[in-house]
């Protein structure tokens, strides 16, 4: 594993009836999978689950050179079939989105 594979910085937030909740950050030299798992754990442990279906990204980094490091944003959305987590990563080529469904057995499936 190279250093290029590490360095994901993730933001999680919940949007409920009272507006956006406090943002929590997970930073460090992590792989995408590690960062996603940490962010999901943070989401569930802090009850950040109230995002309605018209969720939107409110954090836009990568606009300047100082934020050119690869990072991601995790959104947790409620679905009829269960919880789904949207992982958006940003790099020099732009935005990429992945959808992970958290199954009952705790395993994630990438539905990109």
How would you label these PLM feature ranges?
Residues 8-11, 38, 42, 95-98:
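A general secondary-structure boundary signal
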Residues 3-4, 15, 32, 41, ...:
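Polybasic, lysine/arginine-rich low-complexity segments
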Residues 18-32, 99-101:
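A short, exposed loop/beta-hairpin motif centered on an aromatic-Gly-Thr core
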Residues 2-24, 86-87:
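Short aromatic-glycine-(Arg/Gly/Cys) micro-motifs in beta-strand/loop hairpins
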Residues 1, 44-112:
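Short, mixed-charge low-complexity intrinsically disordered segments
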Residues 30-50:
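A short, charged, amphipathic alpha-helix used as a generic interaction element across diverse proteins
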Residues 5-7, 25-32, 108-111:
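A generic structural signal for ordered secondary structure
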């Amino acid at each position: 594993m190279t250093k290029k594979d590490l360095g994901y910085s993730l933001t999680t937030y919940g949007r409920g009836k009272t507006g956006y909740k406090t943002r929590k950050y997970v930073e460090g030299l992590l792989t995408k999978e590690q960062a996603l798992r940490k962010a999901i754990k943070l989401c569930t442990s802090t009850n950040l689950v109230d995002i309605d279906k018209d969720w939107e990204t409110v954090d836009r980094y990568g606009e300047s050179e100082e934020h050119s490091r690869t990072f991601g944003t995790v959104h947790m959305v409620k679905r009829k079939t269960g919880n789904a987590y949207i992982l958006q990563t940003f790099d020099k080529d732009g935005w990429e989105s992945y959808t992970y469904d958290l199954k009952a057995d705790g395993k994630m499936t990438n539905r990109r």
